[in-house]
Amino acid sequence: MKKISFIAASITLLATTGTADDTTRPNVIVIYTDDQGYGDATCLNKNAKFSTPNIDRLAHEGVLFTDGHCSDTVCTPSRYGLLTGRYSWRTELKRGVFQAERPCLIPDQRMTLASLLRDNGYQTAMVGKWHLGMDFPGTRTTRDWSQPVLDMPLDKGFDYFWGIPASMNYGVLAWFEGRFAKVPPTEYTSKKPNKIALDDYRIMPPYDQSASVKDANAAGNFSGKLEVAPDFSDISCLDRFTTQSIEWMKKRNIDKPFFLYLPYTSPHKPVIPMDRFRGQGQAGAYGEFMIETDWHVGRILDFLEKEGLDENTFILFTSDNGPETTWKKRKELFQHASNGPYREGKRSIYEGGHRVPFIVRWPNGITSPGRTYSSPVCQTDLLATLADMVGAELPKDAGEDSQSFLPALTKAATVNRVPMIHHSSRGEFAIRDTQWKLVMGSTKKRNQELYDLSNDPGETTNLIEKQTERAQALRQKLTHIVRSGRSTKGNAVPNDTPYWDDLFWMTEAEYQQPDRTVQSVEKKTKIHRLASTRRSVFDAFSYINRLPEAPYEDESSEDFSGRIFGRLANQEGRILLKSPPGMS
């Protein structure tokens, strides 16, 4: 009770206030496509079989990063890396992706792009696909959609959420606004054939009133039909997401800067362009879908220009991973290379799996727009970049793998990035340091490969036998980055888990983690729903119990107090004084 009294008293001292330069700080928009390969934009692929004029406009009026990377090679881990500035393999997620329903990979107390900017006077919104886990009321057969969704974007720094929980193949498909579905997903569907695309499916009416449901297994998978709302249709996603984003921006507080995270569902399956785009381009339905995606990007740009917001809005356009395996058939049928000149695609440890479009447009901030930046940059770097931009200092337990690339924008300077770690959906590791890339191989094969990307971007010539000392040095750097809990400067911090098999090149003893007095910052406490307990009360005590209880070994009492106040300010007092955000 002493701790609760202290926190309750502290809340009276907290207030969210704007700063004198709120009206001059840039707005921030992150447009995040799904499975778009490096070669799926004409500014990166002059031989593309379709045109992307609006994406190209971002490049012509901004900076085109030709060596930009996502932090993993599939949806969930890349999204974690983008939002937190930390590699997802440091968490419990070592391989693959999440289902729609499970505890969120981001703990409430971990800093995100949204919480960073909200704490610095921004209004924050997410519109689109989440795919980091949510806590839905009940189970597939016992849903109570009058109850709120928990452990979701509103708990991770976003003031507003409108979108879907995950990829469409994982179900629970409805248009969610805040913590509630606009129309609950009370019907069921199987995947229907998609006759216009390669190896694809559809999610569209008619839907069923019941489904044959089998028990979920330990991994959270299930057999049976997907939960879906009567008004949901796959073909509507891009249009609805763009329209809702524009509506939110129209209703924003014009006296405060805003942050919009817009993760689209394209060109991920189902590949289903609207009729108006059929017949365009020369790459089948996939090309038409990319043309539609580009058109929606243009809608955002047109709105910003109309409202006089385009000059002072920082836009990052990028993708969560390389292209789906259908890239091989597209190359054969249409001579379109979704992976550009790079090896393989989605899920792969090679460049085609994680080198993606990466473009920043910010007229008021970029020096010499229209240029190309050829040094490495990672999506994890966005957190440190935005912190740098707003003049904020990242705490010790945030952005462990994030390095600011702001000088590359504002000064046209080259940033000497620390070694970058790549990670595949199968748990494989690689390390990139300058032009050198060491691929560690799979747990089974353990066939290490070394490539000189400056002379061999297609990763065709393995130099491991000729460059043994260089390979050994890279292995040592990789080991250090893994076990230190961070790749950027700062004291070592622990990862979230003990040793795992994918770290086969080091022993369990070598993995020994740094000690820290308090590890409650990353303690993952699932908030269970209790029928006899009011959600607001239970959430309040659960949140308090996850606050830091003591300072780090090298942390002053002032810094410790500031860390607690920062956590509470991020919640704006709502967790104790009333229901969680989005609940009445």
Roles of regions detected by a PLM:
Residues 24-29, 61-66, 119-125, 156-159, ...:
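Loop/turn elements at helix/coil->beta-strand transitions in domains of secreted/extracellular proteins
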Residues 30, 37-126, 132-144, 158, ...:
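Active-site segment of extracytoplasmic enzymes that catalyze sulfate/phosphate-ester chemistry
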Residues 171-172, 176-181, 188, 221, ...:
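Active-site His/acidic residue clusters
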Residues 257-258, 263, 292-330:
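Metal-dependent active-site segment of extracytoplasmic phospho-/sulfohydrolases and closely related
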Residues 21-26, 33, 37-38, 64, ...:
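Long, internal low-complexity/basic segments
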Residues 47-52, 69-74, 100-111, 191-193, ...:
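A short beta-strand-to-alpha-helix junction
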